[in-house]
Regions:
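Short helix-capping/linker turns of helical repeat alpha-solenoids
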Residues: 1, 5-6, 14, 19-23, ...
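A generic structural signal for well-ordered alpha-helical surface patches
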Residues: 27, 31, 51, 55-58, ...
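Short coil/linker segments at helix-helix boundaries
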Residues: 35-57
Length: 81
């Protein structure tokens, strides 16, 4: 769904997978809110939310994602609008 640009559906599917304990889904869900990722994706009309991105990256970290810590650090160094 992300590759197709359907962020809303991707978020819904990722949330369901997070409820099942998926660290990868939590990481992916965080990415759907991450302003850097959304910019790279070229997702126009989708609001970035750094707080939500951080929340889901933190959850991914709690579930065992090693990538989540890097994403949290990168997000922390991103200038806020």
């Amino acid at each position: 769904m992300l590759k197709l640009g359907d962020i809303a559906t991707a978020r819904l599917l990722f949330r369901r997978a997070v409820l099942a304990g998926s660290a990868e889904a939590a990481l992916d869900l965080g990415m759907t809110y991450d302003p850097l990722f959304l910019r790279q994706l070229g997702a126009n009309g989708v609001d970035a939310d750094m707080n939500s991105a951080h929340k889901w990256y933190q959850r991914a970290h709690e579930l065992g994602s090693s990538e989540a810590s890097r994403r949290i650090e990168r997000l922390a160094s991103t200038p806020r609008p």
